[in-house]
Structures are given as C-alpha cells and as structure tokens.
C-alpha cells in the first residue's frame, strides 16, 4: 500500500490511534470541567509516554492500539460519575467515545469486562442503573454485533473450524505463577500507591474508573494465561493512568497510616519507581543477532522461509529483516506442539481417549507440514534449538530428519539454527565453474 513497508503503515496507524485517543479524551475532560483538568493537561506528556514509549515490545499490538482508543470511554465514564457536573455528555461525544472504545472489544471480546466495571462504578456513584444503558454502550454493542455478523458472513470457516480449534487446543494451554511474578507483584505495587494517593473525603472520578478498568483488566490476563506482555498492558496502563489522575488532583490529603511511617520518600518518587518496575517486561526485545541476519542476507536473496518452532518469535522479525517470505499455512508449530503437550497431560491423568484425540490432532498437523515442505521446498528453515519436546517428535517419530537431510546448516546462535537448502542458488549468482580436465575435448581445442 502506497509503496510503504507494512511496518511503517502499522506504526503510522498506531500513532494516529494515540493522537485520536488523547485528543478526544482531552475534549471530554475539558468539557466535563474536572477540578484537576489543568494539571491533567500538564501531565499530557506523561500520558503520551505511556502510549508511545512504555509499550516497548508491545508497541502496535492489538491491545496497545485498543487501549489508546479506549481512554475516551474512561473519561466519559468519569464524567457520568460526577454528581456535581453542570451538564451530562451530549450524544455526539457519547457516539464518538463508543466508536473509539469499541476497538478494544473487537480486539478480544472478553475485554468487555473493562467496559462493564467502570459502568458499574458510575451506576453505584449515581445510584442508578440508567448509566449501564447509556448511548455509548449501545454503540459498542451494535458495532460488536455488526462485526461478528460480518466475520460470520465473509469467513464462515472462522466460527466453524478455526475458533473451535483455538478453544480446544490453544485456549487450554496456560501458565499461572509466571504471570503472578512477572505482572502481579508490580500491579499490586501500583494499586498500593493508588491507595496511598487516594484523597481523603473526596471521590476522584477519573482515578476511580481507571482503577476499576485496571482491576477488570487482570481477569483477561489470567484467563488468557499466556503471560505475554501485551496481555498485561491494559491492566498496567489503567493502573498507571489512575496514579497520574491522582497526582493531578489538587491538594491531596493523604490518609494517615502508622504502618507506612517508614516510607519517607515523596510519593511521586515511589510512583516513578513503580512505573519503572512495571516497565521491565516491556524492555526486552526479540530482535535476532546481527551476525545471524548478516549471514543469511549474504547467502540468500528474498528467500522463502519455514519454521520448525512452536513460537513465531523464532521467525519474526527475522523474516522481515532478511526480506523473507513465509510459505507455510501455519507459520509456527503452536498447533502441533500444544496438541502434544495436551496429549501428555491427558495421558498422565489417565484419560487415554483424550490423549489419543490430541495425538491425532498433532499427527494431522505434522503430516500437512511434511507435505508442505515437500511441495514448497522452502529456501530457509529456522529451527528452534531449545524446543526439544517438539523437535524430538518431529525428528524421531515423523521423519523430519530426512527432510532436513536436503539442507545444510548455514549459521546458528544460542537459540536458533538456520538451515539452507542444498541446491539453493542465490539469484544473480552463478555457481563456480568446475575446472576443465587437460584431456577434455575443450582443452584439446585450446
């Protein structure tokens, strides 16, 4: 599109989403007339940093873009929660906030809980359920229904084939303690600071709806149970946003607490420390080493690529950095690897029928992968070295060692091994000429 790389267009769309989200939120906050409006505008760069810098390795993920557009809806909820508001939001702002906020639900429907929780705060605050049926919620519901209907009409195979497989295999693989350690402790620290910053005898509506959304955002994180940093971003962002909103409240009166007398540093410093700790999971990158990339680029030109790995990070962004092209229907082997894991779990629990069912899913996947390798003959095979449970099955049981016998090792690092097809010839490069025997007719004619 427009001759630009996809990464450029995705980044441009992300920055546009951030601009729309912050601008519309600013309009809503200003019209609502919050006492902290001036301070919030002064903290605008901090909110922008949370949407542009803080996401780190989650930048341009669906949750990131969805949260950038979700902020106006939170601001609208805060406005509706005000008991002393001079006026209520008009239909135009409600429509825009609903349109903007619906993106997060289109990303993943269970983020609807992040809409419901702030709406319940408004209902309790106003002592009326009318806010649950506000215009913005009807807009969100309508968009979701239209989207689901469109997907079902255009891609009926998604609901018929793909979604049941995702629920049966992908959805059943999860972790718990890594999420608690990686995100739970830092999130609890943020909530602790929210409690410390909460003003006495006041109800800061903006902070309240952000906190409610943050608490609600923890449920999808544990429900998905994968531990990816972008899954935690909605909950972490809303918690930090609540802290910013509390810092903007004028003349905050802190709650006295003898248990916290040891805390002598200013709360702003503690807030900065909490944000820094919460940022740690977003700091790391999956960029491959320059030596690996250079070796592949030197030997190939726009190669076709296939993975032997359950994790797509083995091939992305590597594939883009070498100007490669994935040729497999399933880019990564998550389906086969997850089915293998579930089969072993079922066998350990004594459920033989379930174990055999998942074995069959794995076998069908591997056979289709072998057929694709034979038919498409990828130039490059990216092999994940530390995924032994899966790769040992491919090599020992399904004969992928015979497939890789037609490849040679080009380069490898600590995590990946790159195979190059034996008969691959780099476009534009002629193979070296064979020396001519002195007894040959050509030599004799010379």
Region roles according to the model:
Residues 12-34, 41:
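Transmembrane-helix motifs of polytopic, lipid-linked glycan transferases
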Residues 22-29, 183-207, 211-217:
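Hydrophobic, aromatic-rich transmembrane alpha-helices
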Residues 56-66, 228-229:
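Short acidic/glycine- and proline-prone juxtamembrane loop motifs at membrane-interface regions
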Residues 65-85, 93-101, 239-242:
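Specific aromatic-rich, kink-prone transmembrane helix
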Residues 68-69, 113-114, 224-258:
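Hydrophobic/aromatic-rich transmembrane helices and adjacent perimembrane loops
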Residues 89-109, 115-120, 214-222:
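Membrane-interface alpha helices of multi-pass inner-membrane proteins
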Residues 110-111, 151-157, 267-436, 440-442:
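Extracytoplasmic
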Residues 114-141, 198, 253:
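Perimembrane helix-loop-helix junctions
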């Amino acid at each position: 599109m427009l001759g630009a790389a996809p990464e450029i267009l995705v980044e441009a769309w992300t920055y546009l989403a951030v601009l729309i989200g912050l601008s519309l939120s600013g309009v809503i906050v200003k019209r609502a007339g919050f006492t902290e409006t001036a301070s919030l505008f002064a903290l605008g760069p901090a909110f922008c940093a949370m949407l542009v810098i803080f996401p780190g390795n989650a930048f341009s993920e669906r949750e990131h873009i969805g949260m950038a557009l979700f902020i106006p809806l939170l601001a609208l909820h805060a406005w509706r929660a005000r008991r002393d508001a001079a006026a209520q939001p008009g239909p135009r702002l409600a429509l825009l906030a609903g349109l903007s906020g619906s993106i997060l639900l289109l990303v993943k429907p269970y983020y609807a809980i992040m809409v419901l929780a702030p709406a319940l705060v408004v209902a309790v605050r106003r002592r009326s359920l009318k806010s649950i049926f506000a215009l913005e919620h009807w807009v969100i519901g309508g968009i979701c229904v239209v989207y689901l209907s469109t997907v079902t009409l255009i891609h009926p195979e998604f609901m018929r084939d793909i979604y049941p497989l995702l629920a049966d295999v992908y959805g059943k693989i999860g972790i718990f303690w890594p999420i608690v350690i990686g995100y739970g402790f830092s999130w609890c620290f943020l909530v602790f600071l929210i409690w410390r910053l909460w003003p006495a005898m006041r109800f800061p509506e903006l902070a309240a709806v952000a906190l409610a959304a943050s608490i609600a955002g923890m449920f999808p994180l544990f429900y998905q149970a994968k531990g990816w940093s972008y899954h935690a971003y909605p909950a972490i962002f809303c918690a930090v946003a609540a802290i910013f909103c509390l810092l903007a409240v004028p003349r905050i009166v802190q709650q006295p607490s003898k248990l916290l007398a040891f805390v002598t540093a200013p709360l702003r410093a503690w807030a900065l420390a909490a944000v820094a700790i919460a940022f740690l999971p977003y700091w790391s990158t999956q960029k491959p080493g320059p030596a690996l990339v250079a070796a592949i680029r030197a030997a190939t030109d726009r190669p076709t690529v296939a993975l032997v790995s359950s994790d797509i990070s083995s091939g992305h962004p590597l594939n883009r950095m070498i100007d490669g092209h994935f040729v497999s229907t399933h880019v990564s082997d998550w389906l086969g690897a997850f089915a293998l894991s579930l089969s072993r779990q079922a066998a350990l629990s004594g459920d033989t029928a379930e174990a055999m069912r998942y074995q069959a899913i794995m076998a069908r996947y591997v056979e289709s992968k072998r057929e694709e390798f034979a038919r498409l003959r990828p130039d490059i095979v990216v092999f994940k070295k530390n995924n032994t449970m899966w790769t040992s099955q491919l090599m020992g049981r399904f004969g992928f060692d015979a497939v890789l016998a037609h490849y040679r090792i080009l380069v490898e690092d600590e995590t990946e091994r790159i195979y190059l097809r034996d008969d691959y010839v780099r476009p534009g490069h002629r193979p070296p000429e064979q020396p001519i025997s002195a007894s040959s007719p050509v030599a004799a004619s010379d």
